[in-house]
Swiss-Prot record:
Protein name: Translational regulator CsrA
PANTHER family named in the record: CARBON STORAGE REGULATOR (PTHR34984:SF1)
GO cellular component, one term: cytosol
Gene that produces this protein: csrA
Record carries keyword Metal-binding: no
Length: 78
């Protein structure tokens, strides 16, 4: 992990097209602004984890449907 120190108003640049700017510090909270292309997904960690969990649930539901479908077809063939 790269660790950097920035002050309010200072910016980090990631590759050529993403900037992260420190907008403010208040107690133990830091406000940041992120400029990134539309095709780059930017999420808070808890939101990202929820999205991944939802995707996993959707995959499991699809797998369950396929398994039930093929089990029913196998039962009909007997």
């Amino acid at each position: 992990m790269l660790i950097l120190t920035r002050r309010v108003g200072e910016t980090l640049i990631i590759e050529d097209n993403i900037t992260v700017t420190v907008l403010g510090v208040k107690g133990n909270q830091v406000r940041i602004g992120i400029n990134a292309p539309k095709e780059v997904a930017v999420h808070r960690e808890e939101i990202y984890n929820r999205i991944q969990a939802d995707k996993k649930d959707e995959r499991n539901e699809r797998n369950d449907k396929y398994e039930k479908k093929y089990q029913n077809e196998d039962a009909c063939d007997k």
